[in-house]
Amino acid sequence: NLLQFGFMIRCANRRSRPVWHYMDYGCYCGKGGSGTPVDDLDRCCQVHDECYGEAVRRFGCAPYWTLYSWKCYGKAPTCNTKTRCQRFVCRCDAKAAECFARSPYQNSNWNINTKARCR
């Protein structure tokens, strides 16, 4: 779920950046998403959105609300969960958190005018 995803992000980036910085970044990080991602970090969010969509289509999951079990080993969020939905959503979140950690954060892409830049 979204709360657990936030903790995964903190795990992967060693708390180097507050989680809320990712809530309104580029064209895809945060609510909704459209157009061409502005950079690699925004592309991580696009892939995460697509992964959640796949969870809904393939398994009928509710990814924003699905609780799962995971642990933080070093900087690696590791899923340890049973059901198909839990496993799939957990992996979506873990992959995105790791992607965030390896992608540069450009302050100029935070809180952008999405109507103008995300076509």
Curated annotation (Swiss-Prot):
Tissue expression as described in the entry: Expressed by the venom gland.
One BP term from GO: phospholipid metabolic process
GO molecular function, one term: toxin activity
Cofactor: how bound: Binds 1 Ca(2+) ion.
Catalytic activity entry: a 1,2-diacyl-sn-glycero-3-phosphocholine + H2O = a 1-acyl-sn-glycero-3-phosphocholine + a fatty acid + H(+)
Cysteines engaged in disulfide bonds, as pairs: C11-C72, C27-C118, C29-C45, C44-C99, C51-C92, C61-C85, C79-C90
GO cellular component, one term: extracellular region
Cell location: Secreted
Active-site residues, record numbering mapped to chain: H48, D93
Pfam families found in the cross-reference section: Phospholip_A2_1 (PF00068)
EC number of the protein: 3.1.1.4
Annotated SUPFAM superfamilies: Phospholipase A2, PLA2
First-level EC class: hydrolase
Cofactors (names): Ca(2+)
InterPro entries in the cross-refs: PLipase_A2 (IPR001211), PLipase_A2_Asp_AS (IPR033112), PLipase_A2_dom (IPR016090), PLipase_A2_dom_sf (IPR036444), PLipase_A2_His_AS (IPR033113)
Keyword field: Calcium, Disulfide bond, Hydrolase, Lipid degradation, Lipid metabolism, Metal-binding, Neurotoxin, Presynaptic neurotoxin, Secreted, Toxin
Principal location: secreted
Residues involved in Ca(2+) binding: Y28, G30, G32, D49
Sequence similarity: Belongs to the phospholipase A2 family. Group I subfamily. D49 sub-subfamily.
Summary of subunit composition and partner proteins: Heterotrimer of alpha, beta, and gamma chains; non-covalently linked.
Function according to Swiss-Prot or TrEMBL: Heterotrimer: Snake venom phospholipase A2 (PLA2) heterotrimer that acts as a potent presynaptic neurotoxin by blocking synaptic transmission and synaptic vesicle recycling. May act by binding in a calcium-dependent fashion to neurotonal pentraxin-1 (NPTX1) and neurotonal pentraxin-2 (NPTX2), but not to neuronal pentraxin receptor (NPTXR). Also binds to taipoxin-associated calcium binding protein 49 (RCN2), a protein localized in the lumen of endoplasmic reticulum.
Full protein name: Basic phospholipase A2 taipoxin alpha chain
Source organism per UniProt: Oxyuranus scutellatus scutellatus
